[in-house]
Amino acid sequence: DFTVTPSIIKKFELNDELIFVGYGIEEANYNSYEKLDVNGKAVLIWNGMPENVETKRKWNISEKIELAKMKGASAVFIYSDKLEESLVKFEHFYNKPKISLVEQETEVQKEVPLITLTEKAAYDLLKSEKRKVKKIKKSGLKIKDAFKTSLRLSIDKPTDNYTSENVLAYIPGTDKKDEVLVITAHYDHLGKKGDIVYNGADDDGTGTVSLLEIAEAFQLAIKAGNKPRRSILIMPVSGEEKGLLGSKYYSQNPVFPLENTIANLNIDMIGRYDKAHENDSNYIYLIGSDRLSQELHDLSEKVNETYMNFGLDYTFNAEDDPNRFYSRSDHYNFAKNGVPVIFYFSGVHEDYHKATDTVEKIDFDKTGGLTRIYQILF
């Protein structure tokens, strides 16, 4: 009958009045809150817009929720005629456990919860006012007097705490030691489902072993007297598959100041080929290289042209890319904080997020060549 957002809210108590505010919008000729005081009260809002009423724009759900918060609402209930369809279509998503950082949960507990209702649940809450509400909904009239009902809601979800680790390997630089380059890959995958093991050889075993190879190469260079000018932080992160959690934690609790972090090079799935490159394996997708720093982008291209000559494919770097890869790996938490990034990626293949993503399908010549780029860049 209802869903609660944010989904990671684990404890919530509400014992108060619920006030129906109609469509929950505020315009010069139509103000849902004109005669209503909802401060400290829960509000019920219809989705959509009133018919036969001219408004400057169409209000979406997010805008209605923000307005309710500004009015002081303690909780927002919103009726959606698409909820029942959504509950059936995405049942697996609603039923699976949600994972978040402990710090994130603390912040979420302070948020005003959103409860999305089916039509039946919404009318059940309004009880005796059901007929009046239907009339207002159909006509688009404003509410002149508050429709109130008492409400008691208790949410208490069982939770488990788990500990996971990011791994940090630090290589101090020389004359530019205070400038830090962070190189990341995620070492987690999907684990087991029943008796089936999801190995994640490409996603992101290839990135993880690349970090090991890069670390080894830097140590050999240091022994030979060739220290990097800038400091290097090599960081396999955890929790990527559960919401980029490891890199999010680091970005919120950085060991080295983010303002001193010159770039993040992120390696995620570089050992296979996608259908677009079945006949040309000498390529790599670069994502984000020019979003925050043209200098980083130009340096990347120059190094590749001089030493490797990979085909650099920027298809997924487009801001309107429907795949949204720019926001789907760990570099994104650095980019959100203004750190220039490059995401190295060889594309999605038929074994993506399947138990068949296994090691014998990896092209190690490809991954080995790419690790040289990272070593040379800085």
Descriptions of predicted regions:
Residues 209, 216, 345-378:
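His/Asp/Glu-rich mid-to-C-terminal helical/loop segments that flank catalytic regions of hydrolases
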Residues 1-42, 47-51, 164:
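Noncatalytic luminal/extracellular "stalk/propeptide" segments of secretory-pathway proteins
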Residues 1, 78-99, 116, 126, ...:
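Protein/peptide-recognition domains central to ubiquitin and immune signaling
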Residues 167, 183-243, 374:
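Alpha-helical metal-binding/catalytic segments enriched in His/Glu/Asp
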Residues 1-20, 108-170:
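A non-catalytic alpha/beta surface segment that caps or lines the substrate-entry region
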Residues 103-106, 111-130, 237-343:
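Metal-dependent peptidase/peptidase-like ectodomains
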Residues 48-50, 81-83, 187-189, 235-242, ...:
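Acidic, glycine-rich active-site loops and adjacent beta-strand->loop/helix elements
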Residues 118, 161-190:
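Acidic/His- and Gly-rich active-site-bordering loop/insert found
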